[in-house]
């Protein structure tokens, strides 16, 4: 019997993460894995959701500094990992996450251009060697992704960043993904059917090796 694993879906705004997560859940269930916990970052616990709101919302009269944003994200992540993800895995439940640490490495390390050694030290200090077993990165041109995101309604504080921010974020995502065999890059600019097929193929191939 396969041990419970932590699977994450990553991507820029408008990359289709919600649809990808549904495909992941369906594929796992088809493989006989029914006991699954869903998480999202930032958030996923009552306290972490409050931190999510602080990161996402505009703060009239006060700028949220990049370092404050980064520390809030890691504080929320620790709450989620320690209070939800690790207990679920220990209980034999699979966990499917909407974002995890790779988001911070890409958005704050790449987009915000925060020092790489600081990013690594913060990750190592807060998470240790904890990481997802398998990650699907939904890759999309930021212009296409933001167009899709705008179609959903009002943009949040981070979604309002300029295009160069998202280009740097995407570049960092791809840089990390290309160096880590546990991360699979999915072309999210394809049709929903093609994207779903690629996700199913990648996930089933990974499951066959567990």
From Swiss-Prot:
Enzyme class: transferase
Binding residues for ATP: 11-18
Transmembrane segments: none
Superkingdom per UniProt: Bacteria
Single Gene Ontology MF annotation: ATP binding
NCBIfam families: DTMP_kinase
Protein family according to the UniProt entry: Belongs to the thymidylate kinase family.
Function description: Phosphorylation of dTMP to form dTDP in both de novo and salvage pathways of dTTP synthesis.
Name of the protein this chain belongs to: Thymidylate kinase
Organism: Vibrio parahaemolyticus serotype O3:K6 (strain RIMD 2210633)
High-level lineage: Bacteria, Pseudomonadati, Pseudomonadota, Gammaproteobacteria, Vibrionales
């Amino acid at each position: 019997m396969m041990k419970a694993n932590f699977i994450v879906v990553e991507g820029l705004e408008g990359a289709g993460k919600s649809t990808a997560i549904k495909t992941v859940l369906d594929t796992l269930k088809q493989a006989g894995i029914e006991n699954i916990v869903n998480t999202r970052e930032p958030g996923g616990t009552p306290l972490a959701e409050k931190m999510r709101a602080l990161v996402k919302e505009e703060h009239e009269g006060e700028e949220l500094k990049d370092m404050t944003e980064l520390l809030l994200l890691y504080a929320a992540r620790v709450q989620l990992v320690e209070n939800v993800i690790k207990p679920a895995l220990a209980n034999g439940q699979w966990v499917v996450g909407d974002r995890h640490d790779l988001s911070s490495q890409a958005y704050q390390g790449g987009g915000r251009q925060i020092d790489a050694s600081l990013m690594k030290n913060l990750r190592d200090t807060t998470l240790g060697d904890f990481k997802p077993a398998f990650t699907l990165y939904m890759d999309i041109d930021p212009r296409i992704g933001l167009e899709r995101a705008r179609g959903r309604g009002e943009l949040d504080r981070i979604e309002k960043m300029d295009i160069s921010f998202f280009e740097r974020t995407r570049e960092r995502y791809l840089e990390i993904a290309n160096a880590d065999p546990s991360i699979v890059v999915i072309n999210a600019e394809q049709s929903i059917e093609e994207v779903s097929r690629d996700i199913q193929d990648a996930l089933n191939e990974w499951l066959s090796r567990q």
